[in-house]
A protein has these predicted regions:
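Hydrophobic transmembrane alpha-helices and their membrane-interface caps
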Residues: 95, 122-131, 135-191, 231, ...
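Helix-loop junctions and hydrophobic alpha-helical segments within the transmembrane domains
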Residues: 99, 106, 110, 186, ...
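Signature of alpha-helical transmembrane segments and their immediate interfacial
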Residues: 211, 281-335, 735
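Surface-exposed amphipathic alpha-helical segments in non-transmembrane regions
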Residues: 8-47, 70, 74-96, 328, ...
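Hydrophobic alpha-helical segments
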Residues: 176, 207-210, 217-278
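Hydrophobic alpha-helical transmembrane segments of membrane transport and translocation systems
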Residues: 260-265, 760-811
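Juxtamembrane "pre-transmembrane" interface segments
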Residues: 37-40, 51-126, 210, 228, ...
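Transmembrane helices with small-residue packing motifs
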Residues: 26, 161, 229-239, 312-352, ...
């Protein structure tokens, strides 16, 4: 029977023994020279340029990053499930740990926000109850909270927003706002029931006739302030957009509730007050305090109206103070958070061996592990995020214990202790940094500047410019941990090839360089199979034969006559220095300057100082650009004034369209700067910075202050239109609106207290938003509501004078 049989042979080698048996030469006497006779064959790692470990032991570090659009919490959960399943098949002695998980900070931060949300809700309920002094009345505005929040969740789903830090912070602010409209409705209904002895149904009907327009106007204005900021571009626009949509939707839904459900509940739940029923002492005290406050408030307005010049001068001082605070309050992009870890970079002199770097790294790890606040220390020796692979660098990631386990020790205190210890190491420089506030924007927190060699600037010019900038910046106390990525003087051995000799010897030039590379570095020659995978085969000289300059004399190439020629006869060697690598940014050779601001300085201040040094000390062909978070901060830095101006413009245009008049919008807007001054004064008092979160709170504050002003101005306008005296109308409106404005403002202010005193993960963000709004609303409710009636009177008088002048001119 005829059959077909395939012929097979040995393919790729797969064992050390097979490689050792490779025949290199057959001698005339019949002997063979095999690979094992001239070389050591072993399974080794593909690279020895870096080492990694954890808590002083060896470890393979695996970083897992999520793709854009993925949910961090879901990814982390699935990774943990997968690792748990894979670990069942690990060989004995091999185990895994997850020392670093950024989602731990995210989940803890969200937990703290939930806690703040609950605290704010409790405080708002208490304020509402003490203000309305009846559980029946309290239920009506409180019902607006879950309805508004649940409805907001639905719209967040439609817009594709997740439940993250920004949206949750927006919901915290919303809690103090969504009850406002319902409180105004309930207070007005109860006042009419008491004063006019009407039934709940009739009182509700009459109250809504006078309130509907004001409620719609106030809520629309509060939503309108977020319209311009929603269209900002970049990272800042994303931050504003999620926050603004959350607030705007919750406010609009609360207004819908106040116009529909709240009146129905008022007519069904509220009951007339029994005059014979004994008064609660607490409520009696509160009512007495409110009555005295109302009387003094109206009296204060009378005095203010009688001295317009003093008020206008004072208002001018307010405007000047705002500009002063705007220049004096330090700026930054986002507040620095305690994310539960920080990095330490050790920089030894260039040319240091990996073994020496490992020794210093082990000492640093041993010290860090003694700190009771430290849980893990992960090290990558021979690498740095600032310069890449370098045997003279080592990066340590210090993962701290959970926030509750650290007592009162802050990450700043821990980093200072580490800095004080490691700076005593004479053999290295130490750089400490926190992670970027927004993962992915830069490799670390702090600032990141790019010095660029433009035009005719050479690499040497860039080196000199970098040294100049580093020198002058290091003289300033505002900087901490200043460093550069420039590696300009790495020790090198230069081999000067005598090309004439090479040609005369008949040696191909490529053989000279390939031989040197094979001995001193490594050369990839083939592949081998193992564990059903393909691995590479490299050749390299043993360590003793590549340690010294003289070893080059042991490297031979074959000449055209068959003789072996040492490389030292084909060239000379000389020690020199040069760059290890040259980085480029926007097509220019660049030097990256990184660092952090000292405790008493902000990132905005140090960025201005660096720009000033660059202008004054560097040549014109050296350019400056910002990257990472610094670029975003620079882009957002000039937006504060423009954002406030746009918000004021939108409020003016909206009110002008709503009331078909320019007088009411001006009367409302001109009373708002005092609230802005209060916000700036608050952050300055608390040592905070003018960052994006503060600006978000500022936009919110303008809307809230405008809302209070509209409640007074809108009612005063109706009184004037009905023929009442201008001043009397303003006083009457202020008298009637004092209690609801005070109640709603107190509810919001106390709702901000948990944010102002926030601690734990994510506390810096909560403080940044809450502090400015908290102090701004206090000033708005104490000083601002005095100015609203005053400016209403002044604007209307000016309006009437213009009308009279026009009539005289016509006649």
């Amino acid at each position: 029977m005829d059959i077909t049989i395939p012929i097979t042979a040995q393919g790729r080698l797969s064992t050390v023994n097979q490689f050792e048996e490779i025949v290199l030469r057959a001698n005339a006497d019949g002997s063979l020279i095999r690979m094992r006779d001239v070389a050591r064959v072993s399974l080794e790692a593909s690279s020895y340029t870096t080492e990694s470990g954890i808590n002083g032991g060896n470890a393979a570090v695996l970083g897992i990053y999520m793709l854009p659009g993925a949910n961090a919490m879901d990814v982390a959960e699935k990774v943990k499930e997968t690792m748990e399943e894979i670990s069942k098949n690990f060989p004995e002695g091999l185990q895994y740990e997850i020392p670093f998980d950024i989602t731990t900070y995210i989940s803890e931060s969200i937990h703290e926000v939930y806690k703040t949300l609950f605290e704010a809700l409790v405080l708002v309920i208490i304020v509402v109850f003490l203000s309305l002094q009846s559980w029946r009345a309290t239920v009506i505005p409180i019902v607006a909270v879950p309805i508004s929040l649940i409805g907001t969740f639905g719209f967040m789903l439609i817009f594709g927003f997740s439940l993250n830090m920004l949206t949750l912070l927006g919901l915290i602010l919303a809690i103090g706002i969504v009850v406002d409209d319902a409180i105004v409705v309930v207070e007005n209904v109860e006042r009419i029931m008491e004063e006019e002895k009407l039934s709940p149904y009739e009182a509700t009907k009459k109250a809504m006739d006078g309130l509907t327009g004001a409620l719609i106007a106030t809520s629309m204005v509060l939503a309108a302030v977020f319209v311009p900021v929603s269209f900002l571009s970049g990272i800042t626009g994303q931050l504003y957009r999620q926050f603004s949509v959350t607030i705007a939707v919750s406010v609009i839904l609360s207004t819908v509730v106040a116009l529909t459900l709240s009146p129905v509940m008022c007519s069904l739940i509220l009951k007339p007050t029994d005059p014979n029923k004994p008064k609660n002492r607490v409520f009696t005290f509160i009512n007495k305090w409110l009555a005295i406050g109302n009387t003094k408030y109206v009296a204060g307005i009378k005095r203010v109206v009688k001295h317009p010049r003093r008020v206008i001068v004072g208002f001018g001082i307010v405007i000047i103070c705002i500009f002063m605070f705007h220049r004096l309050v330090p700026t930054s992009f986002l507040p620095t958070e305690d994310q539960g870890f920080f990095t330490v970079e050790l920089e030894l002199p260039e040319g240091t061996t990996l073994e020496r770097t490992r020794e210093v790294t082990d000492r640093a790890v041993a010290f860090l592990m003694k700190d009771p606040s430290v849980e893990y220390v992960q090290n990558v020796t021979g690498s740095s995020p600032r310069v890449g692979t370098s045997q003279a660098r080592s990066q340590l990631t210090v993962i701290l214990k959970e926030w509750k386990q650290r007592d009162d020790t802050t990450i700043g205190q821990i980093m200072q202790d580490v800095q004080d210890e490691l700076k005593q190491y004479p053999e290295c420089k130490v750089y400490l940094s926190t992670p970027p506030v927004i993962p992915g924007l830069g490799t670390s927190g702090g600032f990141e500047m790019q010095l660029e060699a433009r035009g005719d600037a050479t690499y040497d010019d860039l080196v000199r410019a970098t040294d100049t900038l580093m020198y002058y910046a290091s003289q300033r106390k505002e900087f901490a941990g200043l460093s550069t990525s420039l590696q300009a003087e790495i020790p090198q051995l230069y081999f000067d090839v005598d090309r004439d000799k090479v040609k005369l010897s008949g040696v191909p030039m490529a053989d000279v360089f390939s031989t040197m590379k094979a001995y001193t570095g490594s050369v990839y020659v083939n592949d081998f199979n193992m564990f059903n995978r393909i691995y590479r085969v490299y050749i390299q000289a043993e360590a003793p034969y590549r340690e010294h300059r003289d070893n080059i004399g042991l490297y031979f190439v074959r000449g055209s006559d068959g003789d072996m020629i040492p490389l030292t006869s084909l060239g000379t060697t000389d020690y020199t220095t040069g760059p290890g690598s040259i980085k480029r940014f926007n097509m220019f050779n660049t030097s990256i300057i990184r660092g952090t601001a000292a405790n008493d300085a902000s990132s905005g201040q140090v960025m201005e100082i660096l720009e000033q040094i660059a202008r004054e000390k560097l040549p014109s062909n050296i350019g400056v650009e910002w990257s990472g978070l610094s670029y975003q901060e620079k882009q957002a830095g000039g937006q504060t004034g423009a954002i406030i101006a746009l918000v004021f413009l939108f409020v003016f245009l909206f009110l002008a369209a709503l009331y078909e008049s320019w007088s009411i919008p001006i009367a409302v807007l001109i009373s708002l700067p005092v609230a802005v001054l209060g916000a700036y004064a608050g952050v300055a008092l608390c040592g905070l910075e003018n960052d994006t979160y503060f600006q978000i709170g500022l936009v919110m504050l303008i809307g809230l202050a405008a809302k209070n002003a509209i409640l007074i101005v809108e009612f005063a306008k109706e009184e004037v239109d009905n023929g009442k005296d201008l001043v009397e109308a303003a006083l009457h409106a202020a008298h009637l609106r004092f209690r609801p404005i005070l109640m709603t403002s107190l509810a919001f202010i106390l709702g901000m207290v948990p944010m102002v005193i926030a601690t734990g993960p994510g506390s810096a963000s909560r403080q940044a938003i809450g502090t400015g709004v908290f102090f701004g609303m206090i000033v708005a409710v104490t000083v601002g509501i005095l100015l609203v009636p005053f400016f209403f009177v002044m604007i209307y008088k000016a309006k009437n004078k213009l009308k009279t002048k026009k009539l005289i001119n016509k006649t």
